[in-house]
Each structure stands twice: as structure tokens, then as C-alpha cells.
């Protein structure tokens, strides 16, 4: 939606400038580089091209860099392995790493000193299983962040929230050392692609101003995930982030 693009309209074609703007103007505490162009069903950009872009962004900022693949396991395996190699020692955070590609990405991340985002489809047992597989491979669990899969407002959020509560209870109450990891939620990606975030006021007058609506959807989602134990929120709109930070300061 245009509302999501507006704060970055002067840098949309330049990932390095975009990242620097997020840090310098909007005080981003970390940067997330979402590798949409590598999707085989989209531009199918090469692993080498993606790696060079990641390296340039990493060298241009002084905050942590999270690299999020296209969620096609085979392509992510190739791309994230190459990024691990090209960005040796940059201590990137790489994901999503699933059961299907954990060996290739896990080995590369270990070899080149990166952190991993273990991803599973809204299920406590599957989240634990991916962590066990990574640990069996030799990955230290203190280099793993858990992505339980994130839904936007509605049923998706409720499912994700419920699973995150159970993950937290298993880790803290039951002492399950395979689940005592920080959790990450790729919230902005889900909120801004949903129908309600894009509908103009002519189509849905009862939902109010489209820009404000989507900003509030993202902020409400952020607060919900914070309450369920999230450690890292990936958000898109600066105003949504301000609202989420205001909530944190109240706690």
C-alpha cells in the first residue's frame, strides 16, 4: 500500500540508502533485509546478487542486520549459504530456517559465525523439533532465535499468540531447555499485505482512514505479540513503531 511506501519513497530503489534512513531518521534498533527478489516465482534473483546486496547493507549500518529469505526452502538454502560465506564474520541473523533446509543453512551459519532463525508453522512440537535438529547438527542454541510463524490481526494472530504462550510456558515453567530462545515476529510483512490494510475508504468506509487503520493494525499486533513473549518485532511503518515503543515505556 502507498501508506507503507510513503515514509521511504525517496529510497525505495536503494537498499543501502533505505537501511541508513531507517537507522538515521527513524532510529531503527535493527534492520531487516527481506529478500523478496530471490523468490523463484518473482524475479528469481541469484544468490550472488543477494549476497552482494546484503554485504553492502551490512557495511553501511552499525545496528544488527536480519536477513529474511523468500520462504522457498530450496532457494533459501542456496541464497543464505552464499550470504553466510560472503558476509563471513558479520554476525548476521539468517532465516527462515526450516526442517527442510536446516542442514545446509545451519552448517554455513556455524562455519561463518552467524545466528539462525528457526521457523515452524504455528506448532509447539515442530518448533522444538527444528531446534533439536539444529542442535544435533552442532548449532549452539544460544545462536538460535525462534520464529513461531506470525499472523496479522484476526485468527492468525490468535493462533500465533496461543502457540507463543505455550512456548513461553514450556521454556519458563516446565524448564524445557530446547525452547528457551528469544522469539521473533515478522509482523509488518503480514499486516501490510492483508486486504484490510489496502482497502480504500470508498470500499470500506466503516473501517475509517486507510493509512491510520493499517498503522493501528500493526501497532495492536505488536502489543499483542509483546504480551505473548516476543523479543524481536519486525515492523514496517515508523508511526506503528512509535506507538509500540510508547506502550513499552508504559510497562
Question: What residue ranges belong to the model's regions?
Answer:
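Active-site mouth loops of central-metabolism enzymes
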Residues: 1-17, 42-45, 69-73, 95-96, ...
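Glycine-rich, proline-tolerant flexible connector loops at the mouths of alpha/beta enzymes
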Residues: 2-3, 27-57, 61, 68-74, ...
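Short, acidic/polar
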Residues: 11-23, 79, 216-224
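Acidic (Asp/Glu)-rich catalytic clusters
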Residues: 21-26, 54-60, 81-88, 104-112, ...
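A structural motif
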Residues: 27-28, 62, 114, 230
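Hydrophobic residues within beta-strands of alpha/beta enzymes
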Residues: 30-31, 65, 144, 233
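Short acidic loop-to-helix transition motifs that present clustered carboxylates
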Residues: 72-76, 99-102
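Catalytic alpha/beta core domains of metabolic enzymes, predominantly
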Residues: 100-247
Amino acid at each position: 500500500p502507498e501508506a507503507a511506501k510513503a515514509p521511504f519513497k525517496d529510497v525505495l530503489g536503494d537498499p543501502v540508502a533505505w537501511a541508513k534512513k531507517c537507522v538515521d531518521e527513524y532510529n531503527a534498533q535493527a534492520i531487516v533485509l527481506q529478500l523478496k527478489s530471490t523468490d523463484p516465482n518473482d524475479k528469481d534473483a541469484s544468490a550472488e546478487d543477494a549476497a552482494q546486496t546484503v554485504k553492502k547493507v551490512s557495511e553501511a549500518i552499525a545496528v544488527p542486520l536480519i536477513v529474511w529469505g523468500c520462504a522457498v526452502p530450496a532457494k533459501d538454502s542456496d541464497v543464505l549459504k552464499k550470504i553466510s560465506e560472503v558476509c563471513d564474520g558479520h554476525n548476521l541473523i539468517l532465516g527462515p530456517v526450516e526442517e527442510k533446509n536446516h542442514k545446509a543453512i545451519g552448517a554455513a551459519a556455524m562455519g561463518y559465525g552467524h545466528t539462525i532463525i528457526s521457523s515452524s508453522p504455528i506448532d509447539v512440537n515442530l518448533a522444538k523439533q527444528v531446534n533439536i535438529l539444529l542442535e544435533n547438527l552442532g548449532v549452539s542454541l544460544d545462536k538460535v532465535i525462534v520464529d513461531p510463524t506470525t499472523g496479522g490481526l484476526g485468527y492468525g494472530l490468535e493462533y500465533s499468540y496461543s502457540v507463543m504462550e505455550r512456548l513461553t510456558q514450556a521454556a519458563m515453567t516446565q524448564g524445557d531447555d530446547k525452547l528457551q530462545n528469544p522469539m521473533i515476529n515478522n509482523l509488518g510483512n503480514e499486516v501490510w499485505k492483508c486486504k484490510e490494510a489496502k482497502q480504500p475508504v470508498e470500499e470500506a468506509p466503516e473501517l475509517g482512514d486507510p493509512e491510520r487503520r493499517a498503522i493501528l493494525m500493526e501497532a495492536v499486533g505488536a502489543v499483542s505479540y509483546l504480551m505473548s513473549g516476543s523479543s524481536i518485532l519486525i515492523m514496517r511503518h515508523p508511526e506503528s513503531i512509535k506507538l509500540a515503543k510508547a506502550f513499552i515505556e508504559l510497562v
